[in-house]
């Protein structure tokens, strides 16, 4: 650790040269006192010795103080950088953030349960129909996509309930699958008996007012996250919960039916798989671009196709459980893949040279 910086060394040099200059003036003062009275030589010598000792002590204390001051400054600067790096490391990876379903508010507005899910807890603005939202499956809280992406880039908890949204190493986003015979949703990760879900958790306030979070009509996707039962208050400066524990958090909770939840997760996987489509390759001319339109037009058409697929998939009719199966989701993925391939112009391998007769 470098202690002697340029400014600090200049300060120490000035502190050393000033007492030395005073030492040079001390003999002249003692000589003037000795010329006035020759009988006081002994007392003048004692006073000069005392003055030298005092100046030496003062110089020593000054040097020690300067050294300690420089060390404290270096430690504070180093500690500040360590705290900053530790806060940066607490964020969630971009891949995990993108695994949370994103959609437009107008696409799920007609399917939500209750009057909740109408406001973002980060910017405190109501949702508009054409605004992109991001839904948190562990706690069903919904935020603007830009707001929650910025929040999770430096934090790993939900802004409302402080649920841990970071996945452990080796875990993946829980993708529910449908059983053809029973029609029940099966999660990819088994829930342990000691895990507690957000459903039915209660909060007790200091003023003897009990607030119980509304019981969700759906089980949700709560397999890989641990949601605390009690919402402990934290200050806004620490970057944790922005909502007081006794406030009504229904307006931040978007409760959706199980079928809609499964469709959102499936369509989010489809959208992520079609972000970067492979290009057809020729052995003679290498990679080729899309055959229909330019790159920007292809991405625009693919996004429109995906949006139509989302709207179509969410416009389902609630039927008994045995009727629904995984065939609907597989057909949807196949149709969306074919539509995107057609819009992007990335067809299967074809001959680039005409056949010779």
UniProtKB/Swiss-Prot annotation:
Cellular component GO terms held in the UniProt record: membrane
BP GO annotations: protein ubiquitination
Top-rank taxon, per record: Eukaryota
Signal peptide: 1-31
Molecular function as annotated in GO: transferase activity; zinc ion binding
Residue spans of biased composition, Polar residues class: 198-210, 283-304
Sorted UniProt keywords: Membrane, Metal-binding, Phosphoprotein, Signal, Transferase, Transmembrane, Transmembrane helix, Ubl conjugation pathway, Zinc, Zinc-finger
EC number in record: 2.3.2.27
Swiss-Prot/TrEMBL catalytic activity: S-ubiquitinyl-[E2 ubiquitin-conjugating enzyme]-L-cysteine + [acceptor protein]-L-lysine = [E2 ubiquitin-conjugating enzyme]-L-cysteine + N(6)-ubiquitinyl-[acceptor protein]-L-lysine
UniProt subcellular location: Membrane
Main location: membrane
Stretches the record annotates as Disordered: 172-210, 281-304, 327-357
Pathway: Protein modification; protein ubiquitination
Membrane topology label: Single-pass membrane protein
Residues that bear Phosphoserine: 273
Basic and acidic residues bias (residue ranges): 340-357
SUPFAM superfamilies for this protein: RING/U-box
Zinc finger (RING-type): 120-162
InterPro entries to which the protein is assigned, alphabetical: RING-H2_zinc_finger (IPR053238), Znf_RING (IPR001841), Znf_RING/FYVE/PHD (IPR013083)
Pfam families for the chain: zf-RING_2
Domain observations: The RING-type zinc finger domain mediates binding to an E2 ubiquitin-conjugating enzyme.
Recorded family membership: Belongs to the RING-type zinc finger family. ATL subfamily.
Protein name, as recorded: Putative RING-H2 finger protein ATL37
């Amino acid at each position: 650790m470098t202690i002697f910086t340029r400014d600090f060394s200049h300060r120490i040099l000035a502190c050393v040269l000033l007492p030395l200059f005073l030492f040079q003036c001390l003999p002249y003062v003692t000589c003037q006192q000795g010329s006035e009275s020759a009988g006081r030589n002994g007392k003048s010598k004692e006073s000069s010795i005392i003055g030298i000792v005092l100046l030496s002590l003062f110089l020593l204390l000054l040097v020690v103080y300067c050294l300690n001051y420089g060390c404290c400054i270096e430690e504070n600067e180093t500690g500040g950088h360590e705290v900053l790096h530790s806060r940066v490391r607490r964020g969630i990876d971009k891949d995990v953030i993108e695994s949370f379903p994103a959609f437009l508010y107008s696409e799920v507005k007609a399917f939500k349960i209750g009057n909740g899910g109408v406001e973002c807890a980060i910017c405190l603005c109501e949702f508009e129909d054409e605004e992109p939202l991001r839904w948190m499956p562990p706690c069903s809280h919904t935020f603007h996509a830009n707001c929650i992406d910025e929040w999770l880039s430096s934090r790993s908890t939900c802004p409302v309930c402080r649920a841990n949204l970071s996945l452990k190493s080796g875990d993946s986003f829980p993708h529910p699958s449908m059983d053809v015979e029973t029609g029940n949703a099966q999660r990819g990760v088994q829930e342990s008996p000691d895990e507690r879900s957000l459903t039915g958790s209660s909060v007790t306030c200091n003023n003897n007012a009990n607030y119980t979070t509304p019981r969700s009509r759906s089980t949700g996707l709560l397999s890989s996250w641990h949601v605390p039962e009690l919402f402990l208050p934290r200050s806004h400066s620490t970057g944790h919960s922005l909502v007081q524990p006794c406030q009504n958090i229904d307006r931040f909770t978007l409760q959706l039916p199980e079928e809609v939840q499964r469709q959102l997760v499936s369509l989010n996987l489809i959208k992520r798989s079609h972000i970067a489509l492979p290009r057809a390759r020729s052995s003679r001319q290498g990679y080729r671009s899309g055959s229909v339109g330019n790159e920007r037009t292809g991405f625009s058409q693919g996004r429109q196709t995906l949006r139509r697929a989302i709207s179509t998939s969410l416009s389902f009719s609630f039927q008994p459980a045995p009727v629904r199966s995984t065939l609907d989701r597989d057909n949807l993925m196949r149709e969306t893949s074919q539509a995107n391939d057609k819009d992007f112009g990335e067809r299967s391998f074809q001959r680039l040279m005409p056949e010779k007769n």
